[in-house]
Each structure stands twice: as C-alpha cells, then as structure tokens.
C-alpha cells in the first residue's frame, strides 16, 4: 500500500472541502427567490437562508 499516494489523495480532498466553505447559502425572501438557486423541495422561504449549496438539494 502506498502511504504517500494516500496522503496526496487526502490532501486533495481537504482542499476541495476548503473550497466548499466559500459556497455560502443564499438568503431568500420568498419561495420564488429560493427557487432561483434551489431545486425542490421549497417550503416556507420567508426571510430564511436557503440551505441550498452544492451537495444539499433542500431549501428551507
């Protein structure tokens, strides 16, 4: 087993997760606002922060 290879893969994945932190959820005032950024299910999006970031399909 190649320990150096494993370290390279793990460091690449850590860099990917750090980039993901920059993708902040969108603040939406209405279901329509949320729908611009999110794909289903969209419910009760009044002055909420959409949980819609890549990898999380749910809105409010």
Swiss-Prot record:
Stated name of the protein: Putative defensin-like protein 279
Organism: Arabidopsis thaliana
Signal peptide positions on this chain: 1-14
Subcellular location: Secreted
Any single GO CC term annotated in Swiss-Prot or TrEMBL for this entry: extracellular region
Primary location recorded for the protein, binned into one broad class: secreted
Disulfide bonds: 28-45, 34-50, 38-52
Keywords of the record: Antimicrobial, Disulfide bond, Fungicide, Plant defense, Secreted, Signal
Family named by the database record: Belongs to the DEFL family.
Organism taxonomic ancestry: Eukaryota, Viridiplantae, Streptophyta, Embryophyta, Tracheophyta
One Gene Ontology biological process: killing of cells of another organism
């Amino acid at each position: 087993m190649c320990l150096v290879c494993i370290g390279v893969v793990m460091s690449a994945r850590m860099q990917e997760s750090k980039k993901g932190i920059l993708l902040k959820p969108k603040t939406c005032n209405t279901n329509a606002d949320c729908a611009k950024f999110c794909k289903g299910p969209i419910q009760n999006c009044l002055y909420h922060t959409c949980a819609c970031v890549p990898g999380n399909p749910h809105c409010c």
